[in-house]
Amino acid sequence: MIEKNKHMILYHGSIDIVENPEIRIPSRSLDYGSGFYTTTSYKQAEDWVKRKLNSNIQVGYVNVYEFDENLLESLNALLFDSPTEEWVDFVMNNRTNKDFNHDFDVVYGPVANDKVYAAFALYEGGIIDKQNLISELKAYKLVDQYLFHTDKALKAVKFIEAKEVTL
């Protein structure tokens, strides 16, 4: 059961201050499809910003938000606590099936980082099966991500501040 008045802090790394998050259609396939991605890990958001910085873009931001978890009860949410067969199928559908779409307001689960991409490549290539992929992924310390897929879900996200990031 969700605790009443439970608020979570979420982070979004960007080269911009994002006071009013929007649903974005990505130019490449992402783990959970289109929307607005956040994480509970400040470091994950900061690392994402640092990968975008270069001689032309010298400043980025970790945008900080508050999310009212009580609102999850009124949203169509898909929650993955760890890598599972269902999570693998969901991520693979989002990444490889251009016609795949889902109607969840919020999706929560592990983020597929570089180590995870390598393991997924082995799975896609038929080198390992789904169970070996899941076992491999459970050995990693995976960071989480929240995808807000609908405007209804984004209404539960309130901007707090933006923290500057430089190299």
Question: Where in the sequence are the language-model features?
Answer:
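Short, conserved beta-strand segments within well-ordered enzyme catalytic domains
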Residues: 10-12, 37-38, 64-66
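Conserved NAD+-utilizing ADP-ribose enzyme module
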Residues: 1-6, 30-31, 51-167
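Extended catalytic/binding region for NAD+/ADP-ribose chemistry, centered on the ART fold
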Residues: 27-52
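Short aromatic-glycine-(Arg/Gly/Cys) micro-motifs in beta-strand/loop hairpins
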Residues: 5-31
